[in-house]
């Protein structure tokens, strides 16, 4: 009988481990499973994944950090990514592929996380109530002429917290507070999600709402005759606020090199095409195709001056500000 040496056993174990990666993701399973399967087919590397709420997954990673069971954390919104990195849970990753494919304002300044798909937090109007060509901006929506015309999603959602963080980063705390206070004064109602905001706008309950683009895409795909249209805000100033879904390598991951290769693949043309198609988001790569629905919205000026790392850094101030003005 032949016996394997300890060195051979360790080498075999390391090789076996490299044949799989584990991802914790707050993205819905139907949005990522086919992307993971494509990678498995192309590389032979099995992608195991666990889904859940971003906060709960971050706590799981924190609890396991000395002996992590996960290699990659994937979630929505730079605020969640920043929180994970600020807790020391993500590794700084050196990769020419990632830094060349992911624009600087859509990744962590220390390369601990990278945006993988883009969504804009835009204004959507009822076309029967708002004239085409109306100048809309986040700041304009705080003015008296929009009183009783604005629908908002709850301030408890990270998407709005990051939007307000952007306003703080752009204008300073006091001016941002004045803007959000104006929103609250002008609001018709506060809704639990973006879809309900859109339905209220379509019904004429309000003239305008602030939502993520893919929610609009999903609804208009099902009901194309709704009197709704995207009206890109801030096109005469700094541009519409954009955010990301993204990912980073977990600190102490046992498969750092393989995890980096997977992240690089997620920023490739093939994966970017799938990201764009599955949820009507904008690909990070300009060479990756958009869906026909997304193309139909036309070009817009995005806010590229605001680094999304600051959306996380300013999140606590944003939450405090919204509480102070009564934005629930």
Role assignments for model-derived ranges:
Residues 12-18:
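Sec/Tat signal peptide C-region and signal peptidase I cleavage site
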């Amino acid at each position: 009988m032949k016996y394997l040496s300890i060195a051979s056993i360790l080498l075999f174990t390391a090789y076996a481990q490299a044949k799989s990666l584990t991802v914790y993701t707050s993205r819905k399973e139907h949005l990522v499973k086919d992307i993971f399967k494509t990678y498995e087919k192309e590389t032979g590397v099995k992608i195991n994944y666990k889904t859940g709420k971003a906060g709960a997954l971050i706590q799981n990673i924190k609890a396991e950090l000395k002996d992590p069971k996960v290699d990659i954390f994937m979630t929505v919104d730079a605020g969640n990514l920043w929180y994970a990195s600020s807790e020391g849970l993500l590794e700084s990753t050196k990769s020419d592929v990632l830094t060349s494919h992911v624009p600087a304002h859509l990744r962590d300044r220390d390369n601990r996380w990278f945006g993988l798909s883009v969504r804009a937090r835009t204004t959507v109007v009822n076309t029967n109530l708002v004239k085409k060509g109306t100048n809309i901006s986040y700041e304009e929506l705080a003015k008296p002429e929009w009183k009783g015309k604005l629908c908002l999603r709850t301030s408890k959602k990270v998407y709005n917290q990051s939007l307000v963080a952007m306003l703080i980063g752009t204008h300073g705390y006091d001016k941002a507070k004045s803007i959000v206070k104006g929103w609250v004064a002008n609001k018709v109602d506060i809704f639990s999600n973006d879809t309900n905001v859109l339905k209220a706008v379509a019904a004429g309950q309000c003239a305008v709402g602030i939502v993520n683009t893919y929610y609009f895409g999903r609804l208009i795909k099902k009901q194309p005759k709704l009197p709704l249209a995207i009206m890109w805000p801030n096109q005469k100033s700094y541009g519409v606020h954009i955010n990301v879904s993204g990912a980073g390598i977990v600190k102490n991951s046992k498969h750092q090199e393989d995890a980096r290769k997977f992240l690089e693949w997620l920023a490739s043309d093939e994966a970017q095409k799938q990201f764009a198609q599955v949820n009507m988001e904008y690909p990070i790569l300009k060479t990756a195709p958009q869906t026909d629905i997304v193309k139909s919205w036309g070009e817009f000026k995005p806010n590229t001056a605001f680094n999304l790392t600051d959306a996380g850094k300013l999140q606590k101030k944003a939450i405090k500000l919204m509480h102070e003005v009564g934005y629930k």
